[in-house]
């Protein structure tokens, strides 16, 4: 008798319609609540908090603000607080207190126009002070120490300002003590860069010929290990960073969808099993992959783009009718996720059998 193939299933547990356009979604850490940030039909900003209870999503609170919101992060929030870092379409950056319903830190015109990407670190780990990084349409990346009102670090592409590539994605990684912090940055012209904040030095840069929609490290508070990037032209790159410092270049595995040819708006490692990750399809698909490590030892001769591991598609499900624009894994419950899409829905999804893949 042949062994039964075990395949995790991607299942929609809850689907709820929204009366506005969502752009980002996050679980409140260590809770069954989630927050959605977006834009109303009257071009206002909206924040909604939902509570997942008894198999349904209940709206708990709602805030409408002057400018529509593009991105958000809880990375600078402590366990005790519920402070959400937000970037909006007018270039404003704020830390919004969800309990009081108002910002407790705000920088007007942090960027000249829309803030496309935001990430934060330090709020819920004992490795340095809370910081927020923002990336904008102006092509500038700014790191904010929340004890001041000026950027602690400003990274601007060289050249004529009007020709600056737009910054579409930012992510913290390698934050494993009070000094070490690294940034992954992706641009609309296909540039991917890794910046060492402690050394104040660019440690990696390469062009991948298509806009970088997302950047993510597999875990923020460990030495650099793996990094994901997704592109407009239906490609996913998984970078092996373990031997990066020793060999001074990067191995990466490329996955290209030449059948569906859909934009991958984002990729997200599963926090409890970091060899597994999902992609958010422009066609509304949610795709689950596994990265299988290579058994070949890394040397300088075989390091770059040779003898890499392999990315395998585990399962896929068309969960939305339009692009999935925001996604978040629950940090405790394996396989539990939330997402928002341009079809104006929020969904709760589960993936089973992940512990035996």
Regions found by a protein language model. Give the residues of each.
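Beta-propeller domains
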Residues: 2-14, 30-63, 96-99
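Structured C-terminal portions of repeat-based eukaryotic scaffold domains
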Residues: 202-357
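Solenoidal tandem-repeat scaffolds enriched in leucines and small polar residues
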Residues: 121-206, 210
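A short beta-strand motif characteristic of beta-propeller blades
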Residues: 11-16, 58-63, 102-108, 150-160, ...
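WD40-repeat beta-propellers
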Residues: 45-51, 93-97, 141-145, 192-196, ...
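Canonical WD40 repeat/beta-propeller blade segments in eukaryotic WD-repeat proteins
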Residues: 20-27, 67-76, 112-123, 161-175, ...
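Conserved strand-to-loop turn within each blade of WD40 beta-propeller repeats
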Residues: 38-41, 87-90, 135-138, 146, ...
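Structural hallmark of WD40 beta-propellers
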Residues: 32-36, 79-85, 104-105, 125-133, ...
């Amino acid at each position: 008798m042949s062994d039964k193939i075990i395949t995790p299933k991607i299942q929609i547990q809850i689907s709820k319609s929204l009366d506005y356009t969502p752009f980002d979604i996050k679980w409140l850490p260590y809770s069954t609540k989630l927050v959605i940030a977006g834009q109303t039909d009257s071009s206002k900003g909206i924040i909604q908090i939902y509570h997942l209870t008894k198999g349904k999503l209940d709206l708990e609170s709602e805030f409408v603000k002057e400018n529509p919101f593009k991105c958000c992060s809880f990375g600078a929030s402590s366990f005790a607080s519920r402070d959400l870092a937000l970037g909006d379409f007018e270039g404003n950056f704020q830390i919004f207190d969800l309990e009081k319903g108002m910002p407790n830190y705000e920088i007007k015109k942090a960027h000249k126009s829309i803030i496309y990407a935001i990430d934060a670190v330090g709020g819920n780990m004992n490795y340095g002070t809370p910081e927020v990084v923002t990336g904008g349409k102006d092509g500038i990346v700014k790191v904010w120490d929340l004890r001041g009102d000026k950027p602690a670090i400003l990274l601007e592409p060289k050249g004529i300002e009007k020709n600056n590539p737009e910054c579409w994605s930012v992510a913290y990684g390698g934050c494993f003590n009070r000094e070490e912090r690294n940034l992954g940055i992706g641009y609309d012209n296909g540039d991917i860069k890794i910046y060492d904040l402690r050394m104040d030095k660019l440690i990696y840069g390469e062009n991948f010929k298509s806009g970088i929609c997302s950047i993510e490290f597999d875990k923020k508070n460990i030495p650099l290990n793996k990094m994901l990037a997704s592109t407009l032209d239906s490609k996913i790159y998984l970078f092996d960073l373990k031997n990066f410092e020793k060999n001074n270049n990067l191995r990466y595995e490329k996955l290209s969808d030449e059948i569906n040819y859909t934009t991958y708006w984002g990729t997200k490692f599963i926090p409890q099993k970091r060899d597994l990750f999902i992609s958010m399809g422009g066609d509304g698909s949610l795709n689950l992959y596994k990265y299988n490590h290579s058994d070949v030892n890394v040397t300088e001769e075989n390091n770059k783009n040779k003898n890499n591991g392999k990315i395998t598609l585990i399962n896929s499900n068309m969960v939305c009718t339009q692009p999935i624009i925001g996604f978040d894994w629950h940090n405790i419950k394996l396989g539990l996720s939330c997402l928002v899409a341009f079809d104006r829905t929020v969904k709760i999804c589960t993936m089973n059998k992940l512990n035996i893949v």
